[in-house]
A protein has these predicted regions:
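N-terminal hydrophobic/helix-forming segments and targeting peptides
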Residues: 2-381
Length: 381
């Protein structure tokens, strides 16, 4: 049994418990101070299947954020726009999306909301290692077959991408009624593959190989007559005219489904576990933490020290009084330095606007930040 400080609310513990195949219990169940994570004795297949479904519905980072949006709206969350005014109310549930691929959701305490005590944040990312489709990607090879021109996106293992059914998903910028609109697209069938050479054509294959992405890993799209069909198929999948597409952000994705395996079915395998496993588990935690905790109470806000270092405990994190925040950023795989990445102003902008909407000044914001806790959730690290 692992004991955690009771100041950490359930939305922190759940992602940890989920990935360890365990569950959370409270001090009232164990008689021990703080929350505990204990071995789970019930079937976990339903939860794992929910994870697999989430991943299947999220073939790109844009789809992942859209899937989370649907879950949040089903739970009664209201979308805010960065370009609009925010009028937050006690007990309100909100989310905001940036660039279609990053999302932040939060809840305002139901009582005495102006005096909230800090933020409790779990942050993950929506993108996964993949191959990005280049503009005008069709490459006619010796007039016999067509490959797609791609570039590596993120830190990947190259070998597992070979000999698997792949397809293409992402986002389009489309001209519609003299306006620019975005549309998600997913070619929902096995479309391309990156084939391995037969062993007699590469005798060194089993001795380790330094893959050249532009030579060895261009996906095979079709025979010679496939030339000129790629964007037509993309347009058809998005239900738009091909000449209405002005720009695209498209990625390969693995079509293989997740599986539960092992002697005792103790392992899972799936595409995009980096990092949709954490995006899913933190979203589940965020939504489930709406339920009041049995030991929920209001305590004095004090600062503790252990070995000369400040720590977060039940004295300075007030259950039910802090603001839980669910963050999912894009472009972690390529350094997070974009407008929608973790290194952007997205999180700070959102927290500052929450603080302002609740009628607090800058000093109150600084105090809130000092009383906050953030968990970076990336299961591959």
């Amino acid at each position: 049994t692992v004991i955690f400080d009771s100041g950490l609310e359930k939305n922190f513990l759940y992602p940890v418990a989920f990935q360890m195949g365990m569950r959370i219990v409270t001090e009232e169940e164990t008689g021990k101070e703080g929350f505990s994570i204990v071995e789970e004795d019930r079937e976990y297949k339903d939860t794992v299947q929910k994870l697999f479904t989430f991943i299947e519905e999220s073939p790109s980072q844009y789809h992942a954020v859209d899937t989370m949006r649907k879950h949040l709206e089903a739970a009664g969350y209201e979308q805010l726009l960065e370009s609009g005014a925010w009028k937050l109310k006690s007990g309100g549930k909100y989310y905001v999306i940036r660039s279609g691929s990053s999302l932040i959701a939060f809840r305002i305490p139901a009582q005495d909301s102006q005096n909230y005590c800090g933020f409790q944040i779990v942050a993950s990312h929506s993108d996964s290692p993949s191959f990005k489709i280049k503009t005008n990607p069709e490459m006619n090879v010796e007039e016999h077959y067509v490959k797609l021109n791609v570039e590596k996106y993120g830190g990947m293992l190259c070998a597992p991408w070979f000999d698997r059914p792949l397809s293409v998903a992402g986002r389009l910028i489309v001209k519609e009624n003299n306006r620019l609109v975005t549309k998600l697209v997913n070619v929902d069938r096995d479309l391309v593959m990156i084939p391995n050479l037969a062993i007699h054509m590469n005798r060194e294959a089993n001795k380790g190989y330094d893959y050249n992405i532009q030579k060895d890993m261009l996906p095979l799209y079709g025979c010679g007559e496939a030339k000129g069909k790629f964007m037509k198929q993309i347009a058809e999948a998005a239900n738009v005219e091909e000449d209405a597409i002005l720009a695209s952000d498209l990625f390969l994705y693995n079509r293989m489904k997740g599986s539960i395996w092992g002697a005792c079915e103790e392992f899972i395998s799936s595409p995009k576990l980096d990092d949709l496993q954490c995006a899913f588990s933190s979203l589940e935690a965020f939504l489930q933490s709406e339920e009041p905790l049995p030991s929920e109470n209001v305590q004095a806000n004090e600062q503790s020290e252990v070995d000369g270092k400040n720590v977060i405990n039940e004295k300075n994190v007030i259950n039910g009084k802090s603001i839980p925040v669910h963050c999912v950023f894009d472009n972690e795989e390529v350094g997070s330095g974009t407008k929608q990445g973790a290194a952007s102003t997205f999180l700070a902008d959102t927290l500052i606007r929450i603080n302002h909407a609740m009628g607090r000044d800058e000093a109150g914001y600084r105090q809130s930040i000092a009383n906050s806790f953030m968990l970076s959730a990336d299961n591959a690290h």
